[in-house]
A protein has these predicted regions:
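Conserved ATPase-coupling elements of RecA-like P-loop NTPase cores
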Residues: 3-16, 39-40, 155, 181-184, ...
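Conserved C-terminal RecA-like helicase domain
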Residues: 96-170, 198-209
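Residues immediately C-terminal
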Residues: 2-6, 36, 179, 195, ...
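Walker B catalytic acidic pair
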Residues: 1-3, 174, 192
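Hydrophobic/aliphatic anchor position in the core parallel beta-sheet
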Residues: 5, 27, 88, 170-171
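Conserved segment of the helicase C-terminal RecA-like domain
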Residues: 25-26, 183, 187-226
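Conserved interdomain linker/interface between the two RecA-like ATPase lobes of SF2 helicase motors
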Residues: 17-28, 33-109, 138-149
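Flexible beta-alpha connector loops of hexameric P-loop NTPases
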Residues: 4-9, 28-29, 65, 145-152, ...
Length: 226
């Protein structure tokens, strides 16, 4: 799965090694963001001497609406929640930026009293014992989640479970959302369209943009994503 990572400078080796070193193995290669796959089909056939079947589809089960806005981030989130487009996942490219936005959004009234009470009941038995725990609990009680690789796994899982129950209006996180996390996000909001790739700051690749934005409007949860 996620075969588009084959071309990644750092992670691609995990996909390249088995294909190149196990020629007698049958592979099922899947990705939602690959373009022309003729090269891979021909290469696999050369490696194992067997025909390669290509199955393609350009239809998305849940259509996406794209928009561009220059209004402040908090104002954009407030507007989307008011328009019924929550939960909103706000994509950042540093953990600090994600946490800063979560704090900023506490000034908004994103969740109703009933929704806040539901979150409070859901996390009543959760122990927020780490130094960062009380801050996370404060945000969650406002209907705001934080999600990135720097959090303890139990906190990330908690945010995912609350999101699956529809108890969070906004989630501030990094592009970890684009890596195999199945949460019912209706709207994906990019805080910016460039990121530091370890060497330089560059505009997001089309692959990264579609991988992340494609998490909006999940089948079985929404009729449309934003």
């Amino acid at each position: 799965d996620e075969f588009h990572w084959y071309a990644d400078r750092d992670r691609g080796v995990a996909w390249q090694v088995p294909i190149l070193t196990l020629p007698r193995t049958r592979f099922l290669l899947m990705s939602a963001t690959l373009g022309d796959v003729t090269f891979f089909a021909e290469a696999l056939t050369r490696l194992n001497g067997l025909p390669t079947a290509t199955v393609t589809s350009h239809d998305r089960p849940v259509p996406l609406d794209y928009a561009y806005s220059e209004i402040p981030l908090a104002q954009a989130v407030d507007k989307m929640v008011a328009e019924g487009k929550a939960p909103v996942y706000v994509v950042h490219f540093t953990q600090k930026d994600a946490a800063d936005s979560a704090q900023d959004f506490t000034s908004l009234d994103l969740a109703t009293r009933e929704e806040k009470n539901a979150v409070a009941a859901a996390i009543e038995e959760v122990r927020f014992t780490s130094p960062y725990g009380p801050t996370l609990r404060k945000w969650l009680r406002q209907g705001i989640g934080l999600h990135h690789a720097g959090l303890l796994p139990r906190y990330r899982v908690l945010v995912e479970r609350l999101a699956q129950r529809g108890l969070l209006k906004g989630i501030c996180g990094t592009d970890t959302l684009g890596v195999g996390i199945n949460v019912p996000i209706r709207t994906v909001l990019f805080s910016r369209l460039c990121k530091f790739d370890g060497r330089k700051t560059a505009v997001l690749s089309a692959r990264d943009f579609h991988q992340i934005s494609g998490r909006a409007g999940r089948k079985g949860f929404d009729d449309r994503g934003y």
